Amino acid sequence: MTKGIIAAAVVMLVASASSAAPYRPSDDATVLVTVPPAAASTQTAFRTAQNALAANPNDLDLALEVARAAIRDGRASADPRRYGQAQAALAPWWSIPNPPMSVRVLRAIVRQSLHDFAGAEADLEAILRLDPRNGQARLTRAFVRQTVGSLADAKDDCRRLPPSVGALAAAVCWLRVQALTGSAASALERLDQVIKIYGKVDPLVLRWAQAVGADMAAMLGQTEAADLHFSEATTDGGDIPTLVAFADHLLDSNRPAEVLTLLAGRSEADIVYLRLAIAGKRLDDARAPHWTALLADRFAAANAGGVQLHLREEARFELEVRGDAATALKLALANWKIQKEPSDARLVLQTALAANDPAAAADVLAFIEKTGLADTRIKPLQDKIAEKKS
């Protein structure tokens, strides 16, 4: 059971990079990335299952199999079409008030991927009312709550996780909340200990724990420790959100050339192209104008279509690539209303400073004070805003 639980949980997390809306190709035939033979074999099996489900759409077990596979692939590739495939697989039960619990958990995950956090939490709450010891729902809700900044509630969910989730998964849940509330040093120390004890149980759980550890180390300004954790989290090549989080760490460490190497040929998702564009601009790479124009077109198309899942990425694009601080601040504040990860807080502070509008950061500063968040990537920004106010 643990693998299924963790597969659901990692969709929710991994350094928050996956919260942004990736590239949405207009044609399913569009090639996002060339896959190795093993992945191609998996995709063939997925299409076979899809075809079988098309012939018998009310087969619940088959629908769950297809939906779970689609979600796993969406998580790994940052391809939003996979979440659409998951929703399509669950179509007979999608709109009914009380679907089977297994459907409800997957519906919550898809809703979370679309930033419908309230809808996701409603589904998970309904499950936990009937089955308080449902580990998958409890763990998933804990990370939804972390994303929206409900840290006390997230801590409560982590505390109430049943043994079925496994010791390492439970530790990651609890320790990440500790890190987000001012205790990153002790949380990372404990996480490293737990990884040594339980890290051989499940490779998927271990990679997830390493990615969380990398973010904790980065919060503490421990560059080498973050490098090590990211390297461990990507030993098998890594999924796209984890690679993007690694790229952000490299950018923070002023290593843009390594970003271009890390992400070369990995995906055509927006979250990848954004990091390439930022790194390319810093290096004056000849490809940077192409990446910039491509992202500008995609964001314009998304806005024209009423899609607002890409606010964090678009804000960074406006700030770090285009240099439009006013637009970036507007987007960052809109994003802050939806999600409240450390990267979201940091973005508001960065854009407020760049736009010379420190007052715009008031809500974020209040949130930081309330939660006790201590992050070396954020503290200098707090200090600069305090200087401007004085």
What are these regions (language model features)?
Residues 52, 92-93, 126-127, 160-161, ...:
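Canonical positions in the second alpha-helix
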Residues 81, 115, 149, 182, ...:
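Residue-level detector of the short coil/turn that links helix A to helix B
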Residues 18-102, 113, 387:
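N-terminal leader/linker segments that initiate helical-solenoid repeat arrays
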Residues 68, 75, 109, 143, ...:
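Residue-level recognition of tetratricopeptide repeat
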Residues 65, 106, 140, 173-174, ...:
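Canonical tetratricopeptide repeat
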